[in-house]
């Protein structure tokens, strides 16, 4: 039976996974989450900690036997028993399936929606609306799956349930008000069943579900940001005023910078994340302003204004055009589910919006449909390999680079951007389209 120490910061939902698993398996897990034993942002940056956990991330687990492991899913797996991991190869595969689904499909939109309401991330209206729709899709998917099931895998709680519940936790506590969640009775029933298990309650306590959807509070956001002490301006003495300007500048340079206020654990967790590098920073500047085209596309007529603007200003050296097709049309069944594939991909590519535009269309009807689209990317190569966050979906599509000067490209851009035309290359009728902008 596993025994050891879990390093984390207080109320870390990722750490909850291992702690709940330990409640089921009987693993002896001690938690160090506060000074003087563990100070997040300091202890996890010491040479001693980094020798054991090179990434410097928490949660991190150190066994009494010296075994060390980081990443919350790996820790939860280690402290689990066979029943939680899946007692057959098939059950184990399904557990991994749902654990992976939680990380890839639930975490991104949940963070985008919830973090601004906690004052730890700035609010972006469009991103939040996209996140809401993605959460709605996820809850619907779970609701359909759980219609005839008590738990996600088998008839008992597994790591699948523990992981997905913990990933949904802040959604249910912060933003899923009754009017939003009432459409998903099976998901709600399963969530409540899990959090009321003694093993869950021992870690989570009593979970109070959201009564009114929390909103972004600009004042709260400003208050949670690190501030610098700014000394009050005082009238200088006569002697001070008489000092040469150069001397006064030197004194200001020598003055120690104002110390920052100490951040709370949540802010420290975010601050500890490595600063994201711009994947397109290596590209030369371009004359084509994508945001201006997007404004034209959103507010003006597509055929008479937006498209002429696009071709007049498109920089073929700084940008590229691509045609994509979904590789597995035989797997597409209900059109609403096919549409969810597109929406899910767009959500996971949220940080690419500044450097991309696309029109992706669903053609056909239930059990006879296809998905294809035209994309605009910064640079001359596909953008997806530039960031691991963007690589979840793109391999499910074929990609063909288009020649901006060809008649075929002109036709494809016109038809896909306007959602009008013969679409002769498809062989199916237009059903609906979605714009990535």
Swiss-Prot record:
Q: Which keywords has UniProt assigned to this entry? A: Acetylation, Elongation factor, Isopeptide bond, Protein biosynthesis, Ubl conjugation
Highest taxon of source: Eukaryota
Domain EF-1-gamma C-terminal: start-end pairs:
276-437
Q: InterPro entries, per this entry?
A: EF-GSTs (IPR050802), EF1B_G_C (IPR001662), EF1B_G_C_sf (IPR036433), Glutathione-S-Trfase_C-like (IPR010987), Glutathione-S-Trfase_C_sf (IPR036282), Glutathione_S-Trfase (IPR040079), Glutathione_S-Trfase_N (IPR004045), GST_C (IPR004046)
Q: Name one GO cellular component term.
A: cytosol
SUPFAM superfamilies xrefs: eEF1-gamma domain, GST C-terminal domain-like, Thioredoxin-like
Can you locate the Glycyl lysine isopeptide (Lys-Gly) (interchain with G-Cter in SUMO2) cross-link? 285
Q: Which GO terms describe its biological process?
A: response to virus; translational elongation
Bias kind Basic and acidic residues: ranges: 221-254
Q: What induces it?
A: Down-regulated in response to enterovirus 71 (EV71) infection.
Query: Which residues carry the post-translational modification N-acetylalanine, per the record?
Result: 2
Q: Which residues carry this modification: N6-malonyllysine?
A: 434
Q: Subunit structure of this entry?
A: EF-1 is composed of four subunits: alpha, beta, delta, and gamma.
What protein is this chain from? Elongation factor 1-gamma
Origin organism of this chain? Homo sapiens (Human)
Instruction: Quote the gene name from the UniProt entry.
Output: EEF1G
């Amino acid at each position: 039976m596993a025994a050891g120490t879990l390093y984390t910061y207080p109320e870390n939902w990722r750490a909850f996974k291992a702690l709940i698993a330990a409640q089921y398996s009987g693993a002896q897990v001690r938690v160090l989450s506060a000074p003087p034993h563990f100070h997040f942002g300091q202890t996890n940056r010491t040479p001693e900690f980094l020798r054991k956990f090179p990434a410097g991330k928490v949660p991190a687990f150190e066994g009494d036997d010296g075994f060390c492991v980081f990443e919350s899913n790996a820790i939860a797996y280690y402290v689990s028993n066979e029943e939680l991991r899946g007692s057959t190869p098939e059950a184990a595969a399904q557990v991994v399936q749902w654990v992976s689904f939680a990380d890839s499909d639930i975490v991104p939109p949940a963070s985008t929606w919830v973090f601004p309401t906690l004052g730890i991330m700035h609010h972006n209206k469009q991103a939040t609306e996209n996140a809401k729709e993605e959460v709605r899709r996820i809850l619907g998917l779970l609701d359909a799956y759980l219609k005839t099931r008590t738990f996600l895998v088998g008839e008992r709680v597994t790591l699948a349930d523990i992981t997905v519940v913990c990933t949904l936790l802040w959604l249910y506590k912060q933003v899923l008000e009754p009017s939003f969640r009432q459409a998903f009775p099976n998901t709600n029933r399963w969530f409540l069943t899990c959090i009321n298990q003694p093993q869950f309650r021992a870690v989570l306590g009593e979970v109070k579900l959201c009564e009114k959807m929390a909103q972004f509070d600009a004042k709260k956001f400003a208050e949670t940001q690190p501030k610098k002490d700014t000394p009050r301006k005082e009238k200088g003495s006569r002697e001070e005023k008489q000092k040469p300007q150069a001397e006064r500048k030197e004194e200001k340079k020598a003055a120690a910078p104002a110390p920052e206020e100490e951040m709370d654990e949540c802010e420290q967790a975010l601050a500890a994340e490595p600063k994201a590098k711009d994947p397109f920073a290596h590209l030369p500047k371009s004359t084509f302003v994508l945001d201006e085209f997007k404004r034209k596309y959103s507010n003006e007529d597509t055929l008479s204004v937006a498209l002429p603007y696009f071709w007049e200003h498109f920089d073929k050296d700084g940008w590229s055009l691509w045609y994509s097709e979904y590789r597995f049309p035989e797997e597409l069944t209900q059109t609403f589910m096919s549409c969810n594939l597109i929406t899910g991909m767009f959500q996971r590519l949220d940080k690419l919006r500044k450097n991309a535009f696309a029109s992706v269309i669903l053609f056909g009807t239930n059990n006879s449909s296809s998905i294809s689209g035209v994309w605009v990317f910064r640079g001359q190569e596909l953008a997806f390999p530039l960031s691991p966050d963007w690589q979840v979906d793109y391999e499910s599509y074929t990609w063909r680079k288009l020649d901006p000067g060809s008649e075929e490209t002109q036709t494809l851009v016109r038809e896909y951007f306007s959602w009008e035309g013969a679409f002769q290359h498809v062989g199916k009728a237009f059903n609906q389209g979605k714009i990535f902008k």
